């Protein structure tokens, strides 16, 4: 097998999106599984759309997820530069070669002329395409246009009536007709920068990329890239186009404009998701190993990764499943580490002072331990722990309705008396007090525990009742009870 070299090639036009993170992650797993190399290349030819720190943000978030790369702008190998904007001197001789072999030509059509042509074609019911207006200009005609101040783009001369086939790792054989790709396409813009399809094909060849794994929104680009390979008599890489990611609730393609779902890695970082959990979750977006297991370490995923198991169906992004996976990892965390993760959120909400005392940290450890089994992400500690920081939790309608039960006043008065009598306020004593209430009132089960839980915590469900009351403290627990009574 050819040495595996794959690349993740982001454009610095925004932050790291879930879909782009998946592309990077599958390339990373494929490279590591095959003892290959994982390359970062920055595709920044669209200078107008690039944002400040876009490259830095993307790479920082990839590193946070746990990916390491073998070559990049900051760690160049022998195939640099690794930013397309720095490779113009590499592209230009190849553009000139296509011009001299008549595989490309200068086009002087203005944007206004092209738009008018497109509208006329649509009015005739034709698929928009470049009509070849400048395809056969004589040198004197070209000189006249340049004398008039027109600057050309360079168009690639698309072969007519030609079929292009490739075997896609995910989708099998794919065929394109050259007459259906929109006519001769631009490979160099007026500012001298190459277009995406030209630069990608050249870079993949010169950087010895063996496999190109990317989203299936790139399928339409593949025939254009194959034509460029053909023009230079180069062997193309193996292509694999991963299915789209859809919103599991709407069934629609994940769109950056859909604000009902968080879609950028840094948003999950800010909420206190764990990188290992994110890596695990993203790896299952459009790929699955044999079996039913869903929790995997990075080492497991590298060992198990098989590109033949990439899904042919759209991958459903399920935020609830991500919360579940993150919870599985959080439950296994060292308590001190998890507490350190949670404290900044409590500080930011004004619930805890900065640099809390050792005594306060011990109390916070108990608080975090109480909610660790159910916590989906670190920032959730603020919402989960409301009852410890508010005067009294607000009851919802279901809780209020339950407190209308016939035996509720009896249970709560008895429990209040039991708590007031306690000299030692710890979990065994609190559990003994609840048992004493059961014996005294004859009420048991849900009718015993639920009123106590609602009165003390304001919630119908939650962590262990004894531990909750102990951490709340005798004074506050009695205060909550009195407010309900």
From Swiss-Prot:
<dbReference type="Pfam" id="PF19269">
    <property type="entry name" value="Anticodon_2"/>
</dbReference>
<feature type="short sequence motif" description="'HIGH' region">
    <location>
        <begin position="10"/>
        <end position="20"/>
    </location>
</feature>
<dbReference type="GO" id="GO:0005829">
    <property type="term" value="C:cytosol"/>
</dbReference>
<dbReference type="GO" id="GO:0004818">
    <property type="term" value="F:glutamate-tRNA ligase activity"/>
</dbReference>
<dbReference type="InterPro" id="IPR004527">
    <property type="entry name" value="Glu-tRNA-ligase_bac/mito"/>
</dbReference>
<dbReference type="InterPro" id="IPR014729">
    <property type="entry name" value="Rossmann-like_a/b/a_fold"/>
</dbReference>
<keyword id="KW-0067">ATP-binding</keyword>
<feature type="short sequence motif" description="'KMSKS' region">
    <location>
        <begin position="253"/>
        <end position="257"/>
    </location>
</feature>
<dbReference type="InterPro" id="IPR049940">
    <property type="entry name" value="GluQ/Sye"/>
</dbReference>
<comment type="function">
    <text>Catalyzes the attachment of glutamate to tRNA(Glu) in a two-step reaction: glutamate is first activated by ATP to form Glu-AMP and then transferred to the acceptor end of tRNA(Glu).</text>
</comment>
<dbReference type="InterPro" id="IPR045462">
    <property type="entry name" value="aa-tRNA-synth_I_cd-bd"/>
</dbReference>
<dbReference type="InterPro" id="IPR001412">
    <property type="entry name" value="aa-tRNA-synth_I_CS"/>
</dbReference>
<dbReference type="InterPro" id="IPR020751">
    <property type="entry name" value="aa-tRNA-synth_I_codon-bd_sub2"/>
</dbReference>
<keyword id="KW-0436">Ligase</keyword>
<keyword id="KW-0648">Protein biosynthesis</keyword>
<dbReference type="InterPro" id="IPR008925">
    <property type="entry name" value="aa_tRNA-synth_I_cd-bd_sf"/>
</dbReference>
<feature type="binding site">
    <location>
        <position position="256"/>
    </location>
    <ligand>
        <name>ATP</name>
    </ligand>
</feature>
<dbReference type="GO" id="GO:0000049">
    <property type="term" value="F:tRNA binding"/>
</dbReference>
<dbReference type="InterPro" id="IPR033910">
    <property type="entry name" value="GluRS_core"/>
</dbReference>
<comment type="subunit">
    <text>Monomer.</text>
</comment>
<protein>
    <recommendedName>
        <fullName>Glutamate--tRNA ligase</fullName>
        <ecNumber>6.1.1.17</ecNumber>
    </recommendedName>
</protein>
<dbReference type="Pfam" id="PF00749">
    <property type="entry name" value="tRNA-synt_1c"/>
</dbReference>
<keyword id="KW-0963">Cytoplasm</keyword>
<dbReference type="InterPro" id="IPR020058">
    <property type="entry name" value="Glu/Gln-tRNA-synth_Ib_cat-dom"/>
</dbReference>
<dbReference type="GO" id="GO:0006424">
    <property type="term" value="P:glutamyl-tRNA aminoacylation"/>
</dbReference>
<keyword id="KW-0547">Nucleotide-binding</keyword>
<dbReference type="GO" id="GO:0005524">
    <property type="term" value="F:ATP binding"/>
</dbReference>
<dbReference type="GO" id="GO:0008270">
    <property type="term" value="F:zinc ion binding"/>
</dbReference>
<comment type="similarity">
    <text>Belongs to the class-I aminoacyl-tRNA synthetase family. Glutamate--tRNA ligase type 1 subfamily.</text>
</comment>
<keyword id="KW-0030">Aminoacyl-tRNA synthetase</keyword>
<dbReference type="InterPro" id="IPR000924">
    <property type="entry name" value="Glu/Gln-tRNA-synth"/>
</dbReference>
């Amino acid at each position: 097998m050819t040495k595996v070299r794959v690349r993740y090639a982001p454009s610095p036009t925004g932050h790291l999106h879930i879909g782009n993170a998946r592309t990077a992650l599958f390339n990373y797993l494929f490279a590591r599984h095959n003892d290959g190399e994982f390359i970062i290349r920055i595709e920044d030819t669209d200078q107008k759309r690039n944002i400040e720190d876009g490259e830095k943000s993307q790479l920082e978030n990839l590193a946070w997820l746990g990916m390491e790369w073998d070559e990049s702008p900051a760690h160049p190998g022998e195939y640099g530069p690794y930013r397309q904007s720095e490779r113009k001197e590499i592209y230009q001789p190849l553009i000139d070669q296509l011009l001299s072999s008549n595989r490309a030509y200068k086009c002087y059509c203005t944007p206004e002329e092209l738009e008018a042509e497109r509208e006329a074609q649509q009015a005739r019911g034709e698929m928009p395409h470049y009509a070849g207006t400048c395809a056969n200009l004589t040198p004197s005609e070209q000189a006249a246009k340049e004398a008039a101040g027109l600057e050309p783009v360079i168009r690639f001369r698309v072969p007519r009536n030609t079929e292009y086939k490739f075997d896609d790792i995910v989708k099998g054989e794919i065929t394109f007709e050259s007459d259906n790709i929109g006519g001769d396409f631009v490979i160099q813009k007026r500012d001298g920068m190459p277009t995406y399809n030209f630069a990608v094909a050249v870079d993949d060849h010169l950087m010895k990329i063996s496999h190109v794994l990317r989203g299936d929104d790139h399928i339409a680009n593949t025939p254009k890239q194959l034509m460029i390979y053909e023009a230079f008599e180069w062997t193309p890489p193996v292509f694999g186009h991963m299915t789209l990611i859809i919103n599991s609730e709407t069934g629609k393609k994940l769109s950056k404009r859909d604000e009902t779902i968080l879609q950028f890695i840094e948003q999950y970082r800010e909420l206190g998701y764990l990188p290992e959990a994110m890596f695990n979750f993203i790896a299952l977006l459009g790929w699955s190993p044999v079996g039913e297991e869903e929790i995997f370490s990075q080492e497991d995923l590298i060992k198990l990764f098989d590109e033949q198991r990439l899904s042919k169906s759209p991958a459903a992004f399920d935020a609830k499943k991500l919360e579940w996976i993150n919870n599985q990892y959080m439950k296994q965390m060292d308590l001190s580490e998890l507490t350190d993760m949670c404290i900044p959120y409590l500080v930011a909400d004004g619930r805890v002072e900065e640099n809390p005392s050792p005594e306060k940290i011990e109390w916070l450890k108990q608080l975090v331990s109480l909610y660790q089994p159910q916590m989906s992400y670190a920032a959730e500690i603020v919402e989960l722990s409301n009852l410890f920081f508010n005067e009294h939790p607000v009851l919802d309608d279901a809780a209020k309705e339950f407190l209308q039960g016939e035996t509720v006043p009896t249970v709560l008065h008895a429990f209040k008396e039991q708590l007031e009598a306690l000299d030692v306020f710890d979990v065994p004593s609190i559990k003994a007090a609840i048992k004493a209430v059961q014996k005294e009132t004859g009420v048991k089960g849900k009718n015993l525990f639920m009123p106590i839980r609602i009165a003390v915590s304001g919630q119908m469900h939650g962590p262990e009742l004894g531990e909750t009351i102990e951490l709340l403290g005798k004074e506050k627990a009695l205060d909550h009870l009195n407010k309900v009574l």
